[in-house]
C-alpha cells in the first residue's frame, strides 16, 4: 500500500493562511511489513528514520497502539521552501494512522486533525482535497470550499536555500489597524472572486496587491523582484511567494509559459526552475 500526498502552494497573495492549491510534486509513503521498531527507508538527508520522524509522530498521535512497520518514503517536495513539505508529511501521517488503525476517518475529520496539528488550513486542505481550496478556521471549526482553478500555467522558482516559516513569520506585524485590515481583506475578496469567475487579469492584480504578508516578506527573498519583473514583461498574470517562501510562483497564460520560463532562466539565479501542474486528486492511495 502506498500513500501519496501532493505539494501545495499556499496564500496565493492575499489568501493568507486560508487559501492554497495542490501542485504536481509528491510525497509517497510505502507501507511495507510489520517490524519490531518503526523504520523509514529514505534518501532525504538528515530526516529521522525512526519514530521521531514527523510522519510517525503524527500517526501515533492519532493511533498510539498501531503496530510498528517498516516504511519507505520518497519525495520531490523540497524542504522548507514554501511548497508544504511539513503539511504533506502531516497528512501522510494521518492517513498512515487511518489505514493501520482502521480509523475510517472522513476527509473532513482528516482536515480538522491536520489543521489542529499544523495550525492553519492553507496547505493541509489542498493536500487532502487537491485543486484550489479556500478555508477558514474559527476555534476548532474548519470550513472549506473546494473550488475550480482556472486553466493556466504555473512556473515555480525554488531557491537553493531554506526559509523556515517561523523566521518568515517574525517579519510580520503583530497587528494591523482597522483601516489596514479592511483594505487587505477587500483585496483578498477580489482575488478570490476574480479567480472563481475566470477574470485572470483582475485576479493577478489582486494577488500582487496583497497587504497581509508579501509586502513584509519580499525582502527575505532576493530573487522575488527580478522574477516578478521578468514574468510581468512576458505576460504573466501574477507572481507571488508560495507559502512563506522562498519558492516563487508565477501564474501565466498557457501560451506564455515557455517565454516566461526562458526569461527567468536567463536571470541566472541559483535554484531550481520547474513547470508545475495543478493536482486535482489530493491525498490518495496508489
Swiss-Prot record:
GO-annotated biological processes: threonine biosynthetic process
UniProt keyword annotation of Nucleotide-binding present: yes
Keyword annotations: Amino-acid biosynthesis, ATP-binding, Cytoplasm, Kinase, Nucleotide-binding, Threonine biosynthesis, Transferase
InterPro entries: GHMP_kinase_C_dom (IPR013750), GHMP_kinase_C_sf (IPR036554), GHMP_kinase_N_dom (IPR006204), GHMP_knse_ATP-bd_CS (IPR006203), Homoserine_kinase (IPR000870), Ribosomal_Su5_D2-typ_SF (IPR020568), Ribsml_uS5_D2-typ_fold_subgr (IPR014721)
Group of enzyme by EC: transferase
Chain positions recorded as ATP binding sites: 78-88
S-S bonds: none
Entry GO terms, CC: cytoplasm
Keyword ATP-binding annotated: yes
Catalyzed reaction equations: L-homoserine + ATP = O-phospho-L-homoserine + ADP + H(+)
Pathway: Amino-acid biosynthesis; L-threonine biosynthesis; L-threonine from L-aspartate: step 4/5
Protein family (similarity comment): Belongs to the GHMP kinase family. Homoserine kinase subfamily.
Protein name: Homoserine kinase
